[in-house]
């Protein structure tokens, strides 16, 4: 059983010769199951369209005949084996000719079972034993009776199973061959008074069961739907009579199946997961992530489907095996990660690139796993305390590693690259939001004294600083952030000092500061921006000063430098100075 395919087993049940196999053939859109009184089904025959496989009609019929013949000699329950057939499609569930607009989600693997009539077969008791053992296979039961059949013993038995195992049940009355619908009054007539009375009697019996078992308000069992397989086979496939309404009962019946599936996706997903846990040999983190994907896809915003019914919803819960798998997986992975974290921290300044990368990847995988598991938090028995304990424990150990590497100064270490810092801060923001300011400032502080300003580095630095500025939460952190930005800008001035166009650059920066920042400076406050302004002004002054030893005590303007720059302007021999980097950084600290 594959995780991603939610298996839904629909069993067609009823007494002998009520038209079960004929009904199956109508759903399949092809006569695969033998019909007629002499063609009674003796062994469960299952059909699935999953994979849209090619099939051979005669081969399927032959296999069914062989299985039925062999079943006649069965003398013990354990020898009853079902026959599985793969076909291309279920016509009635997939075609739109009946005006049914809703479609069954492709993630569902539908299996339709043509079941033996357990009431009068010579192996009746064995089949009843088989059913009591295998009833949990079924997700939806279609109970078929006929308009002249008063024997509801099997119905009574199936109702008890429906309640015990939370199975959906759709009830139909077949052989309503003279049924008519008055479209003006929406009143159904079954053709004769006797048939009308029997139909009322059957549904009254259904109402009594609903009252007796308190199942009236939760849609586990439908009222009996009148259908005529005979009419559908004739009218439904006869293009000359396509406007006739004799097959309208089938439209209601098929809509009931489709709605039972589409309206209870989470219910079927939970049953599927419980089955998979029970039979799967491989149980891993990947399996759990797949389970969470299934639940998320099945519209798990509400706790359970049927949440307004007032029924005991705990029956829909995931199995104890599932919760044990969750607990064991989280505990095991978290413990291994903590051990790795301790080793990395103990390495201190000798932290290894591979060991750090290894543990960092493990932690990201673990936290992604925890996020996926949270889709189950509204289910009973979700181990919230355990999940939170190990999530915080892993994050705390990760922060211990970050403390170590944040003490370094950036000198092209891989783990202090801007791209990696982005990942660290995103992770902290998501899982430990209160620590974001602290570690954002720590990490960017490591880049305050960089030795080079290539364009790609400047672009990355702007992006990370903007990300930090957008997410800082308090004024104190913003002031510290401004200090770091000012350090970077002053360091850039130092980097440019020996460049040919330094004087032009530093004057451009001074003018930029004056236009962008100075209007926002308050008189009664001295902060990092004041230091930046005064340092820039001083650097302009130094750039045009005479630095010879004779001018040590009294700095004069270096006329050579000034005239040289003016001469360049005169000759047009100047450089285009870009201060976009500086402008973008200054825009980030205007909030001061």
Curated annotation (Swiss-Prot):
<protein>
    <recommendedName>
        <fullName>Uncharacterized protein R618</fullName>
    </recommendedName>
</protein>
<dbReference type="InterPro" id="IPR027417">
    <property type="entry name" value="P-loop_NTPase"/>
</dbReference>
<dbReference type="Pfam" id="PF00350">
    <property type="entry name" value="Dynamin_N"/>
</dbReference>
<dbReference type="InterPro" id="IPR005225">
    <property type="entry name" value="Small_GTP-bd"/>
</dbReference>
<dbReference type="InterPro" id="IPR045063">
    <property type="entry name" value="Dynamin_N"/>
</dbReference>
<dbReference type="GO" id="GO:0005525">
    <property type="term" value="F:GTP binding"/>
</dbReference>
